[in-house]
């Protein structure tokens, strides 16, 4: 009866707020405390201020049951805690003070003479639920970004949370998170977060993780290590990440909130990911990666990614143990139409090293295509438009069906090594200088061997020199071949020292000839 009287409840409210305000050296108010027999306490309009007289924490309704106090363990138990309409704001002020210190300085004051005999105070909740809650993390020393996710101005609304076995020990939290959902200011929606969590001023650990957004589903383990809460405001550069993912799905649409340029580029592919990663967002190291996307694209390997979240500054150093893709998957990934020649390469594979930016990189390793295999040491520059790439370096092809690539039925396979410098892959766009040693090339049903080419190919026209020392043909060529017409135009000087026309499939009779020619037709 006494507990239910308004006089006692008003006295209790006044006394609790007085004690807490004195203990934490800040303004704490509770509009009313109600006690319900067998169901517990209800606190209304609880306000907790910080050292700047701004809001640290506020809750419209807070309900709980008193579970008891164990003096030997310094453990207070509260059961079935429910918060309705809560608001929490963590702020780094312009003078670099952090408002949450008003709480941690009391919970863990670092006394000069610590009491090593007394166990730390522990607060235990068997169940915690939050409804219609808001959380903000602000660094007032920084300039805020107007759009996208801003680590210096994080604002989470519509928070719904359910946790069990919730411990607060000094300045650390540990709990079994059953459900967390929220909507961030940028538009990023967290549909579900579950796992075993530990949160303290130095780390945020999530094990048995299951995180779902509209486009992603991250599973297994994710840890964040930092030197104080203030570093969360500089998340991309200060917070150390460690993840171990298994059969997770990651959608690039979620990256749009962190790198708006990706939205402009309309990059929206989804990836299935397994592997390990550690480092900051700005400097990630990856290993044992297994990434799949599109219909048949896969990457297995390790490496590092620097420069995120800026896509333009993203620098890749990747070791590919096995990578496969095709023109259709690439077109869907980068939202550009590739030349038909790329589609004829079929399923392409690469095993080697990839370093550089996504628009300017070096690929060194072994190539595999449906038309033949090879080795590359090439620098590719895709440019801002991603339409006509430029390249330079060395390329070797083995038993490669170049006739099928360029859609010329009279041309067959070839093996060659070449130094190239130019741009474009489409026949109408290509501008390339090359120096090539051709082990063989098939033409008109004959395999020509031992050929060297030095020249330029531009505007569907080749200009250069060819020296052939085949057993059935010795030819020295200097001139041009123009492929702009249905019937090629030739302008060259040629010294045919020896040519067996029957062996070369130009005649059925045993005709061998040699000549010098000056051709223009």
Question: In which residue ranges do the predicted regions lie?
Answer:
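N-terminal type II signal-anchor transmembrane helix
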Residues: 1-24, 87
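Flexible beta-edge/linker motif
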Residues: 5, 32-101, 106-141, 157-178, ...
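Tryptophan-anchored aromatic micro-motifs
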Residues: 125-133, 434-436, 494-496
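Outer-envelope beta-barrel architecture signal
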Residues: 55, 77-79, 126, 171-173, ...
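Transmembrane beta-strand segments that form the barrel wall of outer-membrane beta-barrel proteins
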Residues: 176-180, 203-210, 283-291, 359-368, ...
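Outer-membrane beta-barrel translocator/channel fold
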Residues: 248-252, 323-331, 404-406
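Sequence/structural signature of outer-membrane beta-barrel proteins
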Residues: 400-404, 441-443, 499-503
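Amphipathic hydrophobic-ligand
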Residues: 23, 52-66, 142-161, 187-196, ...
């Amino acid at each position: 009866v006494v507990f239910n009287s308004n006089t006692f409840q008003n006295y209790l409210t006044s006394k609790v707020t007085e004690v807490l305000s004195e203990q934490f050296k800040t303004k704490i108010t509770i509009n009313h405390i109600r006690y319900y027999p067998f169901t517990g306490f209800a606190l209304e309009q609880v306000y907790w201020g910080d050292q700047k007289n701004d809001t640290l924490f506020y809750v419209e309704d807070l309900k709980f049951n008193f579970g008891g106090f164990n003096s030997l363990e310094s453990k207070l138990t509260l059961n079935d805690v429910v918060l309705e309409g809560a608001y929490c704001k963590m702020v780094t002020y312009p003078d670099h003070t952090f408002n949450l210190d008003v709480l941690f300085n009391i919970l863990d004051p670092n006394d000069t003479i610590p009491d090593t005999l007394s166990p730390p105070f522990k607060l235990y909740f068997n169940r915690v639920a939050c409804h219609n809650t808001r959380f903000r993390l602000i660094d007032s020393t920084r300039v805020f970004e107007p759009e996208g996710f801003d680590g210096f101005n994080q604002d989470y609304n519509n928070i719904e949370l359910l946790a069990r076995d919730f411990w607060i020990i000094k300045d650390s939290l540990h709990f079994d998170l059953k459900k967390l959902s929220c909507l961030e200011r940028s538009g990023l929606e967290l549909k579900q977060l579950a796992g075993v969590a530990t949160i303290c001023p130095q780390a945020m650990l999530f094990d048995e993780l299951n995180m779902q957004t509209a486009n992603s589903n991250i599973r297994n383990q994710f840890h964040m290590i930092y030197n104080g809460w203030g570093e969360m405001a500089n998340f991309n550069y200060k917070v150390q990440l460690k993840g171990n993912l298994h059969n997770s799905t990651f959608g690039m649409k979620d990256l749009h909130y962190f790198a708006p340029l990706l939205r402009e580029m309309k990059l929206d592919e989804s990836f299935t990911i397994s592997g390990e990663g550690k480092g900051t967002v700005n400097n990630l190291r990856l290993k044992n990666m297994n990434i799949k996307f599109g219909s048949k694209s896969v990457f297995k390997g390790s490496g590092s990614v620097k420069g995120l979240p800026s896509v333009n500054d993203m620098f890749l150093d990747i070791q590919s143990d096995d990578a496969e893709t095709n023109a259709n998957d690439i077109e869907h990934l980068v939202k550009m139409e590739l030349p038909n020649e790329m589609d004829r390469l079929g399923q392409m594979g690469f095993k080697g090293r990839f370093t550089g930016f996504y628009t300017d990189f070096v690929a060194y390793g072994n190539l595999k295509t449906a038309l033949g295999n090879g080795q590359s040491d090439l620098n590719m520059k895709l440019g801002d438009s991603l339409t006509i790439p430029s390249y330079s370096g060395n390329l070797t092809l083995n038993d490669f069906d170049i006739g099928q690539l360029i859609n010329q039925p009279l041309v067959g396979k070839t093996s060659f090594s070449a130094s190239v410098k130019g741009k474009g892959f489409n026949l109408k766009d290509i501008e390339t200088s090359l120096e090539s040693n051709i082990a063989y090339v098939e033409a008109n049903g004959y395999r020509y061997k031992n050929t060297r080419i030095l020249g330029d190919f531009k505007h569907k026209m080749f200009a250069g020199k060819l020296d052939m020392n085949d057993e059935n043909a010795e030819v020295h060529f200097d001139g041009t071949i123009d492929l702009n017409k249905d019937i090629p135009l030739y302008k060259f000087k040629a010294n045919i020292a020896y040519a067996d026309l029957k062996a070369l499939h130009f005649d059925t009779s045993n005709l061998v000839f040699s000549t010098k020619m000056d051709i223009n037709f």
